[in-house]
Amino acid sequence: MNLYDVIKKPVITEKSMYALEEGKYTFEVDTRAHKLLIKQAVEAAFDGVKVASVNTVNVKPKAKRVGRYTGFTSKTKKAIITLTADSKAIELFAAEAE
């Protein structure tokens, strides 16, 4: 698996924004990725970033309805990345930097 295919997108929720103040970043990652691979992908994608720890959460599929038909959303995996104290911050929102 290519390192740049591991991270899909950042998770932008109220809970993840509070964790951002503590230096914890939340990303949706490939379901086949393990913690060491996620750590390598984050350090390769963002310059000057050192990862202290990686916590992962498997998100179960939710039942959704369209009219009378029921189906399920896809299962996903979230990774909560904690950076070291001497690490650079990850620039998630480029508009804030301007």
From Swiss-Prot:
Entry GO terms, CC: ribonucleoprotein complex; ribosome
Superkingdom of the organism of origin: Bacteria
Gene3D superfamilies: 3.30.70.330
Gene Ontology molecular function, alphabetical: rRNA binding; structural constituent of ribosome
Example of a GO biological process term: translation
UniProt keyword annotations, A-Z: Ribonucleoprotein, Ribosomal protein, RNA-binding, rRNA-binding
Listed HAMAP family: Ribosomal_uL23_B
Stated family: Belongs to the universal ribosomal protein uL23 family.
Subunit structure: Part of the 50S ribosomal subunit. Contacts protein L29, and trigger factor when it is bound to the ribosome.
Purpose: One of the early assembly proteins it binds 23S rRNA. One of the proteins that surrounds the polypeptide exit tunnel on the outside of the ribosome. Forms the main docking site for trigger factor binding to the ribosome.
Protein name (Swiss-Prot/TrEMBL): Large ribosomal subunit protein uL23
Species in which this protein is naturally found: Streptococcus equi subsp. zooepidemicus (strain H70)
Lineage, opening ranks: Bacteria, Bacillati, Bacillota, Bacilli, Lactobacillales
Gene (UniProt): rplW
